[in-house]
Curated annotation (Swiss-Prot):
NCBIfam families registered for this protein in UniProt: PRK05465.1
Cofactor note: Binds between the large and small subunits.
Record protein name field: Ethanolamine ammonia-lyase small subunit
Cellular component, GO, one term: ethanolamine degradation polyhedral organelle
Length: 295
């Protein structure tokens, strides 16, 4: 699916909701609008700032303008320079800072207060803590007994579409993108005339847990919004895993359709919501998902 198709879907879905489509967006580069990059090292520079990300470490370049343009065009680690065979101090410190940020978002917990503030029912997998979540992924694929009973008692049965939110491997991905993706997603699904289930939050969930959820609730389509494994310096990326009529015993990974890189520096959450609505409609029409869908 190319950018033009995405924009058409966004316009169509937003129009059906009676809202104006957002202007065509481009992935935001952290270095695009910053001041001219500097080459001198500074211990006072905030390593997470736009200035630090725009820093050029190549000394005495032949074409400084080329390096400046390259540095402004990407958030990748380019133009960092070397000192002999080693990276320069500022480049190394920024690498370590980004690594620390990514590690933190894996280990952090989604606050219970945040979940309550969103009005979400909270359930959990068979995992009891973060350490077990990281070492026993198999247990993150199944709901605990209390969660099963809670879903049966408090959630809409047999929905066309069931939306699930889970922390996954990035707490920031959920808390940062939630407000921009869930309201338009729920509104778009309802506007499409679909029976939408009760959205809820699964703590310590893995992707395959959506199979059990779909089976318990009798959902035709299950949409799981889950935090992606963070990259260096990028801890806010969300993924959507959608599957048609999932079953614990028979559903395999090829049956899922994935939309990844949902964040302000990738696919904007509002655009992603419109694409997910269109995807759910096509899944219901074709009664398929993943590689079984016709393109």
């Amino acid at each position: 699916m190319d950018q033009k198709q995405i924009e058409e879907i966004v316009r169509s879905v937003m129009a059906s909701m009676g809202q104006a489509a957002p202007a065509p967006s481009e992935a935001k580069c952290a270095t695009t609008n910053c001041a001219a990059p500097v080459t001198s090292e500074s211990c006072a520079l905030d390593l997470g700032s736009a200035e630090a990300k725009a820093w050029i470490g190549v000394e005495n370049p032949h074409r400084a303008d080329v390096l400046t343009e390259l540095r402004r065009s990407t958030v990748a680690r380019v133009c960092t320079g070397r000192t002999g065979p080693r990276p320069r101090t500022q480049a190394l410190l920024r690498f370590l800072a980004d690594h620390s940020r990514s590690k933190d978002t894996v280990l952090k917990e989604v606050p219970e207060e945040w979940v309550k503030a969103q009005g979400l029912l909270e359930v959990r997998s068979e995992i009891s803590d973060k350490n077990l979540y990281l070492t026993r992924p198999d247990m993150g694929r199944r709901l605990c007994a209390e969660a099963v009973e809670a879903l049966k008692a408090q959630c809409v049965a047999n929905p066309d579409v069931q939306v699930v939110i889970s922390d996954g491997l990035s707490t920031d991905a959920i808390t940062v993108n939630y407000e921009e993706i869930l309201p338009p997603l729920m509104a778009g699904l309802k506007q499409a005339g679909l029976k939408v289930g009760t959205p809820f939050f699964v703590r310590y969930g893995r992707v395959k847990i959506e199979d059990q959820i779909g089976e318990i609730l009798g959902a035709k389509v299950v949409i799981l919004l889950v935090g992606e494994r963070p990259g260096l310096g990028q801890s806010e990326s969300l993924s959507c895993y959608a599957v048609y009529s999932p079953r614990m015993a028979t559903t395999v990974e090829a049956d899922r359709t994935c939309i990844s890189n949902i964040h302000q520096g990738g696919t904007p959450p509002v655009e992603a919501a419109a694409v997910i609505v269109d995807l759910a409609k096509r899944m219901l029409e074709q009664k398929a998902s993943g590689i079984n869908m016709t393109r």
